[in-house]
Amino acid sequence: VSVFTHPFANASGVGSWPGIAARQAAEVVVGELAGALAHIVELPARGVGADMLGRAGALLVDVAIDTVPRGYRLAARPGAVTRRAVSLLDEDMDALEEAWEAAGLRNDGRVVKVQAPGPITLAAEIELSNGHRAITDPGALRDLAASLAEGVSAHRAGLARRLEAEVVVQFDEPSLPKALGGGLSGVTALSPVAPIDEEVAAGLLDACVLTVGGEALLHCCAPGLPWDLLQ
């Protein structure tokens, strides 16, 4: 559970839940957190397209993903993985809307949270076609961040309309400390991943928040979070 100082909430969930039942999870979230900060859940146990990075596949604009043995890779065009990610996100949104409606919370002044990987973590964990991390290519890094921001903005606005509620965005950045500290592994020992410049990272985060609009949170469960960068 995350605790915030902003007056719109005093508690929320991180986002990821066990199990595969979207409606049951949504009912629990709305029942327990409707008076705090309810959120759309992620159910990674459902498999491909349901985890944090897979969720991004449903949000990216004009960018597709596919699976590889190590995780996800950028793809030339949308395929089964992207379609599955979109379908799972639609299911989660439907489940939250049904629970929200059943609880009588439409236009009730409550706030809802959505989660998405942040631009640094997304680029650090998704591969290019050559197998290297997308973060190693400055152009790919910028394009991914822009696509993510546009997609999350549309996702936020769409859910706000469906629930008739304010929606805030949580960017998950578990890979941010490693990306800044040069701790990301390369394809081989001879191709290390250089640390990303702090100004570049801050600029991408700021751009995402600006594009998304409204309130935004950053969540990182990894040690070594650079607080000075985020202030």
Predicted regions span which residues?
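Residue-level signal for functionally critical sites in structured catalytic/ligand-binding pockets
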Residues: 19, 39-52, 92, 110, ...
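An active-site-proximal structural segment forming one wall of the substrate-binding cleft
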Residues: 82-105, 140-167
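Conserved active-site and cofactor/substrate-binding residues in soluble primary-metabolism enzymes
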Residues: 20, 24, 87, 91, ...
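Active-site loop segments of alpha/beta catalytic cores
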Residues: 147, 151-231
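Alpha/beta catalytic barrel-like cores
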Residues: 1-117, 121-136, 214, 229
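A solvent-exposed, charged loop/short amphipathic helix patch at secondary-structure junctions
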Residues: 127-141, 184-195
